[in-house]
């Protein structure tokens, strides 16, 4: 997995300090970094850092991402966490607890095509 540009431009200590400050100030919010997959043909997102309500579902967050990149309804978008498609109905808080980075942020990547993951169906 390619290193996040947010990770490259911000040292670990600074990211850890920022995420813990955010979690203290907003305990009901999840600090999320969203970046476009390298080879994706969808537009770039206007901002990378989001404070997401803990009770938001992945599907609702994907809707937010779609709106931020102004993607038409006819185009597909896939959001990945550690190269895996998270379940649409999963709460962002559950995804955060399972996949948060050592710096305290949850990193998500979006793409116009299913470039990474496999969808696991129970």
From Swiss-Prot:
This is Autophagy-related protein 8a. A lipid is attached at residue 117 (Phosphatidylethanolamine amidated glycine). It comes from the Eukaryota. Constitutively expressed. It comes from Arabidopsis thaliana (Mouse-ear cress). The C-terminal 5 residues are removed by ATG4 to expose Gly-117 at the C-terminus. This Gly-117 forms then a thioester bond with the 'Cys-558' of ATG7 (E1-like activating enzyme) before being transferred to the 'Cys-258' of ATG3 (the specific E2 conjugating enzyme), in order to be finally amidated with phosphatidylethanolamine. This lipid modification anchors ATG8 to autophagosomes. The record marks 117-118 as: Cleavage. Induction: Induced by sugar starvation. InterPro entries: Atg8-like, Ubiquitin-like_domsf. It is a lipid-anchor. Ubiquitin-like modifier involved in autophagosomes formation. May mediate the delivery of the autophagosomes to the vacuole via the microtubule cytoskeleton. Interacts with ATG4B. Interacts with NBR1.
